[in-house]
Amino acid sequence: DALGTGNAQKQQDINHLLDKIYEPTKYPDLKEIAENFNPLGDTSIYNDHGAAVETLMKELNDHRLLEQRHWYSLFNTRQRKEALMLFAVLNQCKEWYCFRSNAAYFRERMNEGEFVYALYVSVIHSKLGDGIVLPPLYQITPHMFTNSEVIDKAYSAKMTQKQGTFNVSFTGTKKNREQRVAYFGEDIGMNIHHVTWHMDFPFWWEDSYGYHLDRKGELFFWVHHQLTARFDFERLSNWLDPVDELHWDRIIREGFAPLTSYKYGGEFPVRPDNIHFEDVDGVAHVHDLEITESRIHEAIDHGYITDSDGHTIDIRQPKGIELLGDIIESSKYSSNVQYYGSLHNTAHVMLGRQGDPHGKFNLPPGVMEHFETATRDPSFFRLHKYMDNIFKKHTDSFPPYTHDNLEFSGMVVNGVAIDGELITFFDEFQYSLINAVDSGENIEDVEINARVHRLNHKEFTYKITMSNNNDGERLATFRIFLCPIEDNNGITLTLDEARWFCIELDKFFQKVPKGPETIERSSKDSSVTVPDMPSFQSLKEQADNAVNGGHDLDLSAYERSCGIPDRMLLPKSKPEGMEFNLYVAVTDGDKDTEGHNGGHDYGGTHAQCGVHGEAYPDNRPLGYPLERRIPDERVIDGVSNIKHVVVKIVHHLEHHD
């Protein structure tokens, strides 16, 4: 930062801004700024000379902004517009003083949900946010992640001044088969991955905000494809068939009772079982979505889309899936939003509103209208299976890979082994609910925690033995997938049937010296996953200690919270164990990374979340080499640089260290 503001100070400021978000700030320095700072006082502190802040101040002074203590949804057009006005202001700040002052000022004046969203995306996308770790959202807005019963207990603990730790149970009862896999969709780490991915790659993003989000449309496909495939793996582990796709003209079989409440706005609406889709006032008619879908199918059949100027763009080429992802999600990158609509975003709102489609009961938005809560609803995965099948139709239109396409000449994978057993178990995790309850003037905060059960696994290491028969060292890309062998009825799947259900476990780049070599890779280094984020309490302590001690703070290991949680890398499996195929494909790293600058140690979570502000580090299609049809699996088995072995995953009901 030009003013030399260190990471420790920035981290402390962000911590203070997000503390007790529904109450006036308790920090004297922020209070003083909020009362005395004039956002329009000196417009030289903004890159746009104050244009963005002028717009927001006009809305504020004309009393047009959403009031505080009201629900907020990103899918609500007006509310999103307001949050993005604040994002635009923070994004135009030249220095931290400007960022912090505006944040402190608008925190006291704007809707809390809009403020939190704008602050999070600003820290993620602004250069000023580098080095800051955003606290886990489940501690900032706990209502979105914790059921009402536990929140009520937290309130009574606060009132009676008794410390407490309360168990969060998964939604539903044993009468509901879907409850068997609730631990996946309701996992707070998985919720954070989903909401953060959509903050890293927002559908509202325009390049005028500062840079281009590389392969955003393709990543939209791949991240949701992987979430759906992982959900199907968990279903397989619980004796359930893969999730069915959604149909606009058939009933929605599974209802959903979220049993969670907004901080302000009442309970999340319930959707009963077996209802037909209804038109939603002010959103869309069911028929509109059917038309949108048929236009997308038509584009895939023709092999081209039509842009808003009437020109055709070929999609039977490597960038085709990117263009398709942009029009299906409908991000601002869509080539023709007028014609292709906004299938994904509209469908989220349609599903969210089925409990009150005509606004008769004035219910707040449903869980599907928030990325934080969407994966809790079984219909989320049905919706994404439906979209996934549209993408599959596109990828199936490409010719299968040939031996020459797949071969990495001179590179032989001789064997793949796992060092250690593949064991999964459930463990317990606690998070603080202090931000869920209001502070009274004379009531001290007491320690109140929620305790959740989370899927975890023992760490393991891949051992890949290989021979590099080329005349020197070669850069290689290692692509590791886990694939089902049988379906839920015990019928063996062909590779062509299984490939679409495979989950990505890792993708990394490594130099392989000439001759025989053994590559070892720990499961915790996976580029698909992220470690547990530090708690809000820990972030506050670390930042305060650093600021008070006058030293800096390096939290770079936690800067990205986009990624599958480390502990959920493996599917749960069954107590008696399940066998899966582990595929390792080693491809030519020089070709894969051609045109990318810098080293090849892309730590973090580049596989599904890219590299922040840079081009995606791998030129191959996401999912390569399993993303295209495989009519003859001998082609895959016939290349020396791809190997698969059978591995067994066992679920331990008791957790043994």
Swiss-Prot record:
Pfam families: Hemocyanin_C, Hemocyanin_M, Hemocyanin_N
Keyword Metal-binding belongs to the record: yes
Residues the record marks as carrying a glycan: N167
InterPro entries linked: Di-copper_centre_dom_sf, Hemocyanin/hexamerin, Hemocyanin/hexamerin_mid_dom, Hemocyanin_C, Hemocyanin_C_sf, Hemocyanin_N, Hemocyanin_N_sf, Ig_E-set
UniProt key word Metal-binding: yes
Domain of life: Eukaryota
Primary role: Hemocyanins are copper-containing oxygen carriers occurring freely dissolved in the hemolymph of many mollusks and arthropods.
Subunit structure: Hexamer of a number of different chains, of which A, B, and C have been identified.
Protein name as annotated: Hemocyanin A chain
